């Protein structure tokens, strides 16, 4: 795709394209910078940028977008770890396509698990490639899926005051909203059993279910670690 827009009056025009011969000259950081300056001129609104790629000091400007994820369980399994490791680069505003973007086969269970993960992510955003067979709107699913999705979206709205507080803490102190477990428990760093478990703000511990249930038992088993202290099931 190509993007061309005049910024800061008519003095500068930046063209962003995926067809860049030299990756070191990819102008996305500059594009984000000048969009930020442009949005900052409107003091009555809080501007927001959605940036596809990441690099040095990416956290300064956009909400980072992980790119077009496939509609598969394997793709879903990678998202929590991706969100966590982004914190190592200071990136806390990270976003992915809830339900997946393209390819694969849509199914109710995969969609619900993706919604659950999205609810406990810094940015909750539904998005998909064009196509009449991609159902990202919750109301396009069966009644059971709609009910479960509604339950978690209402939970997300109840969490907004908490998320706002954690967002301000990130803004003031640079403490990521999503933190890998090994930030406080270094010994789990090399244990893949816990790599998708994370702290969501300072008070919540999230261990998302990202595996398909067994077709015979009609359930899934999920192993996770509970640190010392008193914890409550938030469900």
Spans of features found by a protein language model:
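Active-site-proximal substrate-binding groove within the catalytic cores of carbohydrate-active enzymes
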Residues: 15-235
């Amino acid at each position: 795709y190509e993007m061309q827009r005049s910024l800061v009056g008519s003095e500068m025009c930046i063209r962003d394209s995926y067809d860049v011969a030299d990756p070191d000259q990819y102008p996305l950081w500059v594009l984000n910078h000048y969009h930020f300056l442009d949005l900052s001129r409107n003091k009555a609104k809080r501007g927001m940028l959605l940036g596809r790629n990441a690099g040095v000091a990416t956290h300064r400007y956009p909400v980072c977008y992980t790119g077009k994820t496939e509609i598969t369980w394997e793709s879903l399994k990678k998202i929590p770890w991706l969100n966590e490791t982004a914190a190592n680069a200071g990136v806390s505003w990270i976003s992915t396509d809830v339900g997946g973007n393209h390819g694969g086969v849509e199914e109710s269970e995969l969609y619900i698990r993706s919604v659950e993960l999205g609810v406990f992510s810094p940015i909750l955003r539904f998005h998909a490639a064009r196509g009449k067979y991609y159902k990202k709107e919750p109301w396009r699913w069966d009644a059971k899926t709609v009910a479960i999705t509604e339950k978690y979206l209402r939970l997300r709205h109840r969490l907004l005051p908490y998320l706002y507080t954690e967002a301000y803490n990130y803004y003031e102190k640079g403490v990521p909203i999503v933190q890998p477990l090994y930030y406080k428990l270094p010994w789990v760093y090399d244990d893949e059993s816990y790599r998708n478990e994370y702290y969501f703000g300072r008070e919540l511990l999230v261990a998302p279910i990202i595996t398909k249930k067994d077709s015979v038992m009609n359930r899934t088993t999920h192993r996770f670690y509970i640190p010392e202290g008193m914890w409550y099931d938030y469900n």
